[in-house]
């Protein structure tokens, strides 16, 4: 049992030549029914020292298994900053734009570059972390029916406006 857990994900990118870099970590603890609702980078909960350890563990793990492509290592963290490996997603996750906004790195482009057999176009020291990003998911649910999925026709859509705003939809 982990009291007050935090779900932290580390984004990595690796190539066939043994190069692996991290692109920071995301806080994914705000969930409902095991579905992420809010993702944030960097996590305001994780101390810098712990973040550095976690990022190093993620990169080393991927190097040891020879992983190449985009991937996400998921960890559970307790209130004392101890972290535990949960799983690795060997794909690009829905929340990857949070990482792109904080690094300026186009993860889709680089995933294609690596899949084509090319080396990563950057080294760890080339990646600059700047600012913070938050992703909020909107679910179509019926609050009067235990929040069951509620498909329907979208009749009005008003996009938010403002600086530094990215709007992705599917």
Where are these regions (language model features)?
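ATP-dependent carboxylate activation and anion-phosphoryl transfer catalytic cores
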Residues: 1-170
